[in-house]
Amino acid sequence: MSKLFYAFAVLAVHVLTSSPTTAASNLPVNLVTGPAFTTPAGAAHRRFLRSIHEGEDSLKPSAFSEERTALRAMAYLLKPKQKKLAAALKKSTSKHKLSVAPEKMKSIQVLGDPKNPEREWFKRLYNSKRGDPQTLRKLGQFKTEAQLSRYIKFYDDMLAKAKNVRVQTK
C-alpha cells in the first residue's frame, strides 16, 4: 500500500514540475533578478566587486586590478605571517615534548614509594589467595608485560622480606 502511495506522490511531483503553469507562476520571482532590478533607472552606475561593467567607476584603477597583483608581492606580504606560524609551531612541539615527560615518569615510578597506587594494588594481589605471578598472568590481571615484570620483582622482594622475618624470629 505504501509503495502505491509513493508512486502516486512521485507522479504528482513530476506532473507539477513539468507543467507550464508552474513556470508562469515563477515569472514575478524571475523579474526580481533581472537587470532592471539590479540597476535602477536614473541611478548612477556603481561598480560592484569584480564586476565587468565599463564606465564611471567610484573605485580607483589600482583597486580593481586585484587579479593582476604580482605573486612576489603577495608572497612578500605573507612572509611575516609565515614566520609567526613557524615560531608558534616550534613552541608547540617543544611544549609537547615537555608534557610527555610526566607520563613517562609515571611509568617509571619507584615501587618503594608508599604513595604509589601500583604498589598498593600489588600488595592487594600479593595478599590474595592467588598471589602467584604466573596465576595472575593467566587470569589476565596485568595489562602489559612491563607491569607483569614489575609485579614479579615486587613479589620476589616480598618473599625475601618474609624469609628474613622468619629467620629473625627463630
UniProtKB/Swiss-Prot annotation:
Motif RxLR-dEER positions after renumbering to this chain: 47-68
Induction: Expression is induced during host plant infection.
Disulfide linkage: none
Claim: Signal is one of the keywords in the record: yes
Keyword Signal: yes
Main localization (coarse): secreted
Role: Effector that is involved in host plant infection. Contributes to virulence during the early infection stage, by inhibiting plant defense responses induced by both PAMP-triggered immunity (PTI) and effector-triggered immunity (ETI).
Family, similarity comment: Belongs to the RxLR effector family.
Domain note: The RxLR-dEER motif acts to carry the protein into the host cell cytoplasm through binding to cell surface phosphatidylinositol-3-phosphate.
Protein known as: RxLR effector protein CRE16
Organism expressing this protein natively: Phytophthora infestans (strain T30-4)
